[in-house]
Amino acid sequence: AHAEMMIYPRILALAEVAWSAPSVKNYDDFHVRALKEVEALKAEGYHPFDLKNEIGNRPGADQPVQHLAVGKKVAYGPDPAYYPGYSAGGDSALVDGVIGGWTYGDRRWQGFIDKKRMDVTIDMEKETEIHSVGADFMQVCGPEVFMPSEVIISVSNDGKEFTELKRMEHKVVKDDKVTFINFGWEGNAKARYIRYQAS
């Protein structure tokens, strides 16, 4: 068992490095594929090193991230909220300080189905100096996990009238790469409510 743990998945990494052209090498993509291969090896009775416990270069995946919105109330709507199968812990998932790992299967990613818009409003409880707002998104085309094509970030003091801080358009390219993108805004604003929309 120890020899298997030393060999797998290192041999997968060796094959990836040796047989892939430099122009197509992508660690993030390899890591997600390796996680699936490790699960397949386990199912076959092998004892590979558990990559899920590896601390890679996804910052915050191994420990909570501190920010001003941690623990604040999040309202979803008016469209239906996240898909129940990918709730990532429910209504507080977006403000719990925990960042999703390398795969949507880690139960840390919140998923939204079809054309339904992600529309969340965070109540900071009082007027607050805001300098950045952002959210990470993952794309894995095989299981139809896609990036948003548009993101809008706005703020408000009354929760009714919102001022747009940033609107981002994104062309969704459907390929076999696993991709992570943070859609965010940086600047200076003062508000009680932060609204984040993605579709």
Where are the model-predicted features located?
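Substrate-binding groove of N-acetylhexosamine-processing glycoside hydrolases
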Residues: 1-74, 79, 191
